[in-house]
Curated annotation (Swiss-Prot):
GO terms for cellular component: cytosol. GO terms for molecular function: ribose-5-phosphate isomerase activity. GO terms for biological process: D-ribose metabolic process; pentose-phosphate shunt, non-oxidative branch. The lineage of its organism: Bacteria, Pseudomonadati, Pseudomonadota, Betaproteobacteria, Burkholderiales. Belongs to the ribose 5-phosphate isomerase family. Substrate binds at residues 32-35, 85-88, 98-101, 125. This is Ribose-5-phosphate isomerase A. It catalyses: aldehydo-D-ribose 5-phosphate = D-ribulose 5-phosphate.
Length: 228
């Protein structure tokens, strides 16, 4: 199966999961990225079951609205039973690197509110040690150079994210992203805490302190489920 076929397979499995596990009338948490987009498309078939959805990005909000979902502001919501999102890498403990799509801060906020985080990914995303995928760090623009020096001191090689057109990439929050290569992440929780303490960092794309509760992994043998 191709990677796109695996993504579609796991997106449908996630839709089946929320149909079974999320009570009618509840609010659904929705992530960002190519696999999350396929999940939105799949879950739209029974969108009337939900009171609405909380989205982690402007892009996902638009896709949800195109399908007729009511998109709610997180400030209006007391409880999210399940948040479904992809990952750029995930390890055996359920810790993840996220943020390849640029929505890491809002993803982390929505995930922190959710009772369960369901990670959906194709088999290539499951790794023994994270760090091959450059670690995204969202940064206040004025602190870009100062934060880059701190990340270099931690052993990383930060690079400012650019758009395809050659401009500086800006997040939905108006900030910039440093993508940090060269890190072998042996202690995800410790590194998440260390980077988050650097002045000027909004958040780091390590989801270890609040990792996945469930992994739905698309493989050539079908969808494998892991509970953490």
């Amino acid at each position: 199966m191709t990677q796109d076929e695996l993504k579609a397979l796991v997106a449908q499995a996630a839709a089946d999961y929320v149909k079974q596990e999320v009570p009618e009338g509840a609010v659904l948490g929705v992530g960002t990225g190519s696999t999350a987009n396929l999940f939105i498309d799949a879950v739209a078939a029974f969108k009337e079951r939900f009171a609405g959805a909380v989205s982690s990005s402007e892009a996902s909000t638009r896709r949800l609205q195109q399908h007729g979902f009511k998109v709610l502001d997180l400030n209006e919501v007391d409880e999210i039973p399940v948040y479904v999102d992809g990952a750029d890498e995930i390890d055996a403990s359920g810790a993840m690197i996220k943020g390849g799509g640029g929505a890491l801060t809002r993803e982390k906020i929505v995930a922190s509110v959710a009772k369960r985080f369901v990670c959906i990914a194709d088999g290539s995303k499951l790794v023994q040690t994270m760090g091959t995928f450059p670690l995204p760090v969202e940064v206040i623009p004025m602190a870009r150079a100062a934060v880059a020096r701190k990340l270099q001191a931690l052993g990383g090689q930060p690079r400012l994210r650019m758009t395809k057109e050659g401009g500086i990439y800006k997040t939905d929050n108006g900030n910039v992203i440093l993508d940090v290569a060269g890190l072998k992440i042996d202690d995800p929780r410790g590194l998440e805490q260390a980077v988050n303490q650097v002045p000027g960092v909004v958040t780091v794309g390590l989801f270890a302190l609040r990792g996945a509760d469930v992994l739905l992994l698309g493989t050539g043998d079908g969808v494998q489920r892991t509970d953490y």
